[in-house]
Amino acid sequence: MNDKIRVGLIGYGYASKTFHAPLIMGTPGLELAAVSSSDETKVKADWPAVSVVSEPRHLFNDPHIDLIVIPTPNDTHFPLAKAALEAGKHVVVDKPFTVTLSQARELDALARSTGRVLSVFHNRRWDSDFLTLKALLADGVLGEVSLFESHFDRFRPQVRDRWREQGGPGSGIWYDLAPHLLDQAIQLFGLPVSMTVDLAQLRPGAQSTDYFHAILSYPQRRVILHGTMLAAAESARYIVHGSRGSYVKYGFDPQEERLKNGERLPQEDWGYDMRDGVLTLVEGETRKEENWLTLPGNYPAYYAAIRDALNGNGENPVPASQAIQIMELIELGMESAKHRATLCLA
């Protein structure tokens, strides 16, 4: 593909409006050609030149559309991605990849058989704080990490009337937030030996998981992943302890908030996180504590990599094989919680 890659976006809810549409439009070599939506006015208010169609099938049947992006309710990921692949399109699916592991494996096999690129939007690989932490560990600054703790805590005590908080397949924060944390952990440390997971519905009227606490066990390391909707006080985003020192970071990557506020790309100061982490290093009897500059986040890198992959100039940034690993952990975690047991990976 030497001309612009024409993208069809399914739906125009929060994920499409906040993440996918502006990131696609801000990526040289990509063109948001059409959106399937029942609310043409909403789409046109943001992107007047973009065509709006009533049904996803119109995108699948359009020979000029190269790539289909699917940021729809989780239980629709599988049928929509399957239909798009069968229509010969390349596909990006928002996380979580699917609702079940078997669905994820079926899509991967279909993409391989059709020779299409299938990628999953695990955008938090490009969070400011995660990129900073990844660099710290790669450089060995903390030594051998023995304890890694990652929180995604919010204060939303009232259950809202939206699909993510209803009781359907793929709802709740084990499917919404945990995939981010699981993906980051695997990026840093690989797959664990075993998992111990607690899932709960703690808010009055909750119909889906609004609390999770997962312990991923490695031979010389424990990884704790935690999420709740009932944390009024600020929690540390990361707490990492190693043989040479520790790193603690508060606050969330700023990119989502800026995109939500309608900022457009590119911008020179994109991704800058004004909150430093705290690095504590110990050598002998000397203990040194310093603020550690947070690297800029880079969500635009995902779609730039998708462009390059479709043009044959680079690798798929998040191939289905990696997203399948997340689905394995999602399902194993649910079994662990159900049986109140520590379960080993197969």
Annotate each predicted stretch with a short phrase.
Residues 1-4, 67-69, 264-265, 291, ...:
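C-terminal helix-rich "cap/oligomerization" subdomain common to oxidoreductases
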Residues 1-47:
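N-terminal Rossmann-like dinucleotide-binding module
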Residues 50-109:
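Beta-loop-alpha module in the N-terminal Rossmann-like domain of NAD(P)-dependent dehydrogenases
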Residues 54, 93, 118-120, 149, ...:
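Hydrophobic residues in well-ordered beta-strands that form the structural core
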Residues 106-123, 144-148:
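Rossmann-fold dehydrogenase core element
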Residues 183-265, 300-314:
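Contiguous beta-strand/loop segments that form the cofactor/metal-binding neighborhood of enzyme cores
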